[in-house]
Amino acid sequence: MLRKKTLRDVDVKGKRVLVRVDYNVPLDEQGNIVDDTRIRASLPTVEYLLDANAKVILMSHLGRPKNRDPKYSLAPVAKRLSRYINKEVKLAPDCVGEEVKRIVNSMKEGDVVLLENLRFHKEETECDENFARELASLGEVYVADAFGTCHRKHASVYLVPKFLKPAVMGFLLEKEITYFEKAMVAPQRPVVAILGGAKVSSKLEVIKNLIRRVDKLFIGGAMAFTFLKAMGYKVGNSLVEDDLQDVARDLIDVAKKLEIKLYLPVDFVIGQEVSENTPTKVVPWQEIPDGWMGLDIGPVSVELVKEIISDAQTIVWNGPMGVFEIDKFKHGTIEVAKLLAQSSALTIAGGGDTDHAIHKAGVYHAFDFVSTGGGAFLELLAGKELPCLVNLDDKEA
């Protein structure tokens, strides 16, 4: 995958460099940035370009606006970024059009312009060729650095690098791909994957791919109940995808054939409904009564995870172990985060909920790498090619 060229492979001095960043940051009701991790993640690329005296043109989307909606403006992002790089970041009034061309053409070396929200134009998500050509005309070099949208076939991600050459990876994208390859392509073994989340359907391709690549796989979260029911156990009112029973049985068989150790939780914290006020108790996996549902993994399962990862050299984690937004049911997820943080293995985690849980556990810095992409991270784990890489320049053999 890293046969793609990176920023270090091209001359950017004095050039207009068009960078697709991911500034899709959460905002509160007043339009203030709640978490600027994604802005900070782009700094190595932006600062490298400034050091090289490039003219830096940044483009991103924010949210899912139906049309031009001021509440989705990138203005707060321009302000925050300028604080980090200690220079003015000019917010263009749009991302295409005559006024934008004029602003870009009058840039001096070391200037930074942030184009307004790409999704103010439906052509972005429609992957429209003319829109992509217009964006491409703004730059002399294209840099892909928006891992969070890498799995989307959108104009700025997929088509612009087709029309604007050279087209290379920025440092964030390079880092994401490098760590993924360390975990999945040429890993130190044993490799352990820990998967959580609610639905098998959303992780099906991931499970199918991982079963062929890892040595041990632990499936937690509500996904576990679909597997337990497929094995003939009662799971009370726990969330189950009945249409995936056969698929779950097949996956269990594949794991057996490949001699991959597939683990499920051995106890659960159960409640009568998904709420802070529900009564709770801890029961072994085969004793969930009718009218109750599993909402977190129990303490014995946490010990099981500890045992599973004890000899691991590489650990990949995606998805919470329970309904961790509710305090009563966050314990399993928080404890797993802490266990991985203490491990000497290479630890890589990804996915919005997972990222949130690691922050909640206060162990973010103890992980080797936490991916900035949710969907893109899952696509990689599922063994799929990312649209954002397709049209980038290949390194010479």
Swiss-Prot record:
Associated pathway: Carbohydrate degradation; glycolysis; pyruvate from D-glyceraldehyde 3-phosphate: step 2/5
Binding site for ATP: K203, G294, E325, G351, G352, D353, T354
Catalytic activity: (2R)-3-phosphoglycerate + ATP = (2R)-3-phospho-glyceroyl phosphate + ADP
Enzyme nomenclature, EC number: 2.7.2.3
SUPFAM superfamilies the record matches: Phosphoglycerate kinase
Localization (cell): Cytoplasm
Molecular function as annotated in GO: ADP binding; ATP binding; phosphoglycerate kinase activity
Catalytic EC class: transferase
GO CC aspect terms: cytosol
Transmembrane segments: none
Residues binding substrate, per UniProt: D22, Y23, N24, R38, H61, L62, G63, R64, R119, R152
Keywords: ATP-binding, Cytoplasm, Glycolysis, Kinase, Nucleotide-binding, Transferase
GO biological process assignments: gluconeogenesis; glycolytic process
One Pfam family hit: PGK
PANTHER family, sorted: PHOSPHOGLYCERATE KINASE (PTHR11406), PHOSPHOGLYCERATE KINASE 1, CHLOROPLASTIC-RELATED (PTHR11406:SF23)
Subunit description: Monomer.
Protein family according to the UniProt entry: Belongs to the phosphoglycerate kinase family.
Protein name (Swiss-Prot/TrEMBL): Phosphoglycerate kinase
Source species of the chain: Aquifex aeolicus (strain VF5)
